[in-house]
Amino acid sequence: MAAHSFTLVPAAYVYLLRPAPGSPRDRDGAVSASTQVLLQLRRNTGYMDGHWACGASGHVEAAESVVETALRETREELGVSVSAAELSPLTAMHRTNDLGGAALEQRIDMFFTLRAWTGAPAVREPAKNAGLRWFSLVDLPAPVPPHA
């Protein structure tokens, strides 16, 4: 049995969702064809630049929970305030770069949705974010990261 050393990198992703303007409000958190998601156009990050990605995301910092990360990144990247009670867990994804025996970097990505916040989402890190835009969940732009 081969021994591997590895690093586990946890991250939080927060998708802001809203009904399309003029459409009825979704009931009980249901997602419909009129639901829109806020995406950011990545730039100058060294990873997936030129892709439309999650509105707010980032790595968990030392002594921080994934929920605390989600709240912090939403505030830092979009300038909106949210309470932990408003975050809805969506899914988790494990990713790895195992290339057959090398040291592994493993990632665990935790995804949340958010339907209520205080403030208007805005680009707060223009060096990394070329713009924000709402898209229909049934008509996403290209390209988007494969894991998002």
Q: Where on the chain are the PLM-derived regions?
A:
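A short coil-to-beta-strand element that immediately follows conserved catalytic motifs
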Residues: 81-91
